[in-house]
Amino acid sequence: TQGVSSAASDVYKRQLQDFTAAVERLVAGIERKGSVLRSDERQVVAYHEMGHALAASSLPAMDPVHKVSIIPRAAGSLGYTLQRPTDDRYLISTQMLRDRLVVLMAGRAAEHLAFGQVSTGAADDLGRATDIARQLVTRFGMSPVLGQAVLERQQAGYLGDSLLRLSLIHI
C-alpha cells in the first residue's frame, strides 16, 4: 500500500509539472534551448524580473508570484514573472489597474536603480502599460482629470478629436 501511495503521489507530481510547463508555454512561449545570454545580459534580465516580482509581492491587490524565470523564450521574452490568480475576477478596480501599471514598470525601474540605465528589454512592458493607461482614461472613464467619460466610443469630429488629444496628453 505504501508503494501504491508513493506511485500515485509521483503521478500527481508529474501531472502538476506537466500542467505548469503547459501554462508557461502558453504565457511565455517555448524555451529557446540554443539561446544563451551573456552574463551581463542575464544579470539585467534577473534584476528586471525581480523588479516585477518584488512589486507584485508588495501590492496586496496583485496575484501572488508563482515563478520567476530568466530563460529566453521563443515569443521574444528573455524572462518572465508568472503570477497565478487565487480566484476568478470579473471586475477590476482603478487601484488594481494602477497596481498593474506599477508591476509592469517595476522591471524598468529595477534596471535603472541597479545599473543607472534601462534596456530595450522593457519595451513590451512599456507597451502593455501604455495600453492600460490609455484604457483607464479613454475606455473605463477612470481619469481624475477628464472624469467619467468614455472617449473611445465617441464619433470622430471636432469635439471627439479634441477630447481624444486631451486624453492622450493626460496619459
Regions found by a protein language model. Name each.
Residues V23, H170-I171:
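Adenylate-forming
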Residues T1-A8, Y12, I169-H170:
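Single conserved hydrophobic/aromatic residue that forms the stacking wall/gate
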Residues T1, V36-S39, Y90, A122:
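Alpha-helix N-cap/helix-initiation motif
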